[in-house]
Regions:
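Conserved AdoMet
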Residues: 1-32, 172
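A structural alpha-helix within SAM-dependent methyltransferase catalytic domains
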Residues: 17-20, 43-50, 160
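Conserved class I S-adenosyl-L-methionine
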Residues: 27-44, 59-62
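Extended basic-aromatic, gly/pro-enriched interface segments that bind polyanionic ligands
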Residues: 34, 57-139, 143-153, 176-178
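Short helix-capping segments at alpha-helix termini
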Residues: 51-57
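Core SAM-dependent methyltransferase catalytic element
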Residues: 137, 177-195
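A short glycine-rich, Lys/Arg-flanked "PGG" loop and its adjoining helix->strand segment in the class I
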Residues: 153-165
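Conserved beta-strand signature within the Rossmann-like core of class I S-adenosyl-L-methionine
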Residues: 165-173
Length: 195
């Protein structure tokens, strides 16, 4: 799926921001965006982190997708101007550069956003996830709807393994994992906490 936009399902970013602010200043954060697509979601995550934690946060985002083409687009961070028209003026100025001349009508995310992100290819269904350290937060939004029940369960078990106890999992608006209460506790609309 490549349907994506900046700050889609905005309540997630409000909850994420409050979660980031809940720890002492300077505490390190490790976050995984497991369906990076063309980059709007990972950049929204990093913008939220910069707003919540200040300009040089101890923050690292791993952004993955199965599709290397969309990852290349994400890593470039270049978008049509109309794709950010829903953002506040403050966010547009703080996080984007406007194209000039032949690049008029385009915007590019500022380099400090990209510096906080590692883009890598990961197939959620395969068991060879490359992660060494567990994450504080995982975004796995609007992917599971494409998997059957047993596959969803396997992926959730793996996410449980790579998420710290008490870590947060954000899922898509159409996704419900109430049958996985042994792994996750519902903490808000489509927000779960790892048991």
């Amino acid at each position: 799926t490549n349907l994506t936009s900046f700050f889609r399902e905005s309540h997630h970013f409000d909850i994420f921001s409050a979660h980031l602010r809940s720890r002492p200043a300077g505490a390190p954060w490790s976050v995984w965006c497991s369906a990076a697509s063309t980059g709007e979601e990972p950049y929204s995550i990093v913008m939220t982190a910069l707003e919540a934690l200040g300009n040089n946060p101890a923050f690292k985002l791993t952004a993955s997708d199965i599709d290397s083409r969309v990852l290349a687009t994400a890593a470039q961070g270049v978008y049509r101007l109309e794709s950010i028209t829903g953002l506040t003026q403050e966010r547009m100025q703080r996080f984007f550069l406007r194209g000039k001349g032949s690049n008029a009508g385009m915007v590019r995310v500022k380099p400090e956003l990209g510096r906080l992100i590692d883009f890598i290819s990961v197939n959620l269904i395969r068991d060879d996830w490359p992660f060494r350290e567990p994450f504080d937060v995982v975004f796995c939004r609007n992917v599971m709807i494409y998997f059957d029940g047993p596959t969803q369960r396997r992926v959730l078990e793996r996410i449980h393994r790579v998420l710290k106890p008490g870590g947060m999992l954000f899922v898509g608006h159409a996704e419900n994992f109430s049958e996985s209460r042994d792994l996750f506790t519902l903490r808000g609309k489509t927000v779960y906490e790892r048991r």
